[in-house]
Amino acid sequence: STSGEGRAIGSTYIEGGFAKRILVSTSSHNMAAEKQFRNPTEYGTPKPNTATFTSTGGVSILLSNKKSKVKVESSTIGKVVDMGTTDVNHMGAVMAPAAGDVIYNHLKDTKRDISYYDLILTGDLGIYGKNIPKDYMMTKYNIKLNDNYNDCGTMLYDLDRQPVLAGASGPACLPLVVFSY
């Protein structure tokens, strides 16, 4: 996500002494994304339940070299993990193996156990993609994601009351939850 990448790069600049304060911002808009990248809204094409709903919002965070209880302690950058999923209306399934892989690599790199964290979040896998990292990590690494795991795509909207299909998506999804929940 642009927010995560911005935090990783910005905190590295601050740690290296190249900056004192860095503002990291990201945004997404439902109708702009739908019209530009997905099914054009003018078509009125129905979407399958696995499709997600691009979140509308903007988030900015200020990174600073001042000591605080809240800090960027580490960053783990992921990679593409292609399991052959090609359904463009089920992006959660496309992204989920990479989410499981980056969680595993973070645990390995930091020499930590899953129970170290109060909360582990994925960005926008949605209700149908949310459980795939659980299965992936158990099958591939014998690691069980516990109740401390959730997906921001399932947290941003009230899935029972708002017509957002499989949940929220887009670059603002995770930071909208993390920095305002």
Roles of regions detected by a PLM:
Residues 1-51:
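A generic, well-ordered mixed alpha/beta core segment in the N-terminal half of proteins
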